[in-house]
């Protein structure tokens, strides 16, 4: 069997994002949901390897969706955990990202207008997906975009993302997505977002390198 991906540890305790994201949600989201994507990605890559060795082209084609879905889930969640931080560790403090803050204000007129635009995008997602702040390069043009299901961001560099799958909020907020979207601003890791914006890396996810 080839080398496998593993579940990355959280950079903070499971209860550290309360009251905005409960300990129960964080434990289930990380230990169960993210682990499932990691397991699915490893299984799909092993199936791809065997299909290639057998020159089984139909199997090679059929396994691509599983690689995309589970690989995207692993990428998105690995980014998500790091773009959150407890309030006591600086979560929610936009002043920790002076370069990014200035770019946001230039693009949207004010930080509050940006938050309103981002939340409108989040609440407009139909079904399951993600909302993202992205840049087209190092300290580049900012934009708000969405991805469906577990599709990762492509063609741009993710600055930060918000998981809008029900498993990210339902046990705490039920169907009140607006309160989840409002609360998560209190735990955004702006220092991490600043680093991603300055780097503008469109594909360099170190956790995806075996």
UniProtKB/Swiss-Prot annotation:
It comes from the Eukaryota. Its EC number is 1.15.1.1. Keywords: Allergen, Antioxidant, Manganese, Metal-binding, Mitochondrion, Oxidoreductase, Transit peptide. One of its GO terms (cellular component) is mitochondrion. Its cofactor is Mn(2+). Transmembrane segments: none annotated. The keyword Oxidoreductase applies. Binds 1 Mn(2+) ion per subunit. It catalyses: 2 superoxide + 2 H(+) = H2O2 + O2. It holds the Pfam family Sod_Fe_N. Destroys superoxide anion radicals which are normally produced within the cells and which are toxic to biological systems. PANTHER family: SUPEROXIDE DISMUTASE, SUPEROXIDE DISMUTASE 2. Homotetramer. This is Superoxide dismutase [Mn], mitochondrial. It comes from Aspergillus fumigatus (strain ATCC MYA-4609 / CBS 101355 / FGSC A1100 / Af293). The lineage of its organism: Eukaryota, Fungi, Dikarya, Ascomycota, Pezizomycotina.
């Amino acid at each position: 069997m080839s080398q496998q991906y593993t579940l990355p540890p959280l950079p903070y305790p499971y209860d550290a994002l309360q009251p905005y994201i409960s300990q129960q949600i964080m434990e289930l989201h990380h230990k169960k949901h993210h682990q499932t994507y990691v397991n699915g990605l490893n299984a799909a890559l092993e199936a791809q390897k065997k299909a290639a060795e057998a020159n089984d082209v139909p199997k090679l084609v059929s396994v691509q969706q599983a690689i995309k879905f589970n690989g995207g889930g692993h990428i998105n969640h690995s980014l998500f955990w790091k773009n959150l931080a407890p309030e006591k560790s600086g979560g929610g403090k936009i002043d920790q990202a002076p370069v990014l803050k200035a770019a946001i204000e230039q693009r949207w007129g004010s930080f509050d207008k940006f938050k309103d635009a981002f939340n409108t995008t989040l609440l407009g997602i139909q079904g399951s997906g993600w909302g993202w702040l992205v840049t087209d390069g190092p300290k580049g043009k900012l934009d708000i975009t969405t991805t469906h299901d577990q599709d990762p961001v492509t063609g741009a560099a993710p600055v930060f993302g918000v998981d809008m799958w029900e498993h990210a909020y339902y046990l705490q907020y039920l169907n009140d997505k607006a309160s989840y979207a409002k609360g998560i601003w209190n735990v955004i890791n702006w220092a991490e977002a600043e680093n991603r914006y300055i780097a503008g890396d469109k594909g360099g996810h170190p956790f995806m390198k075996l």
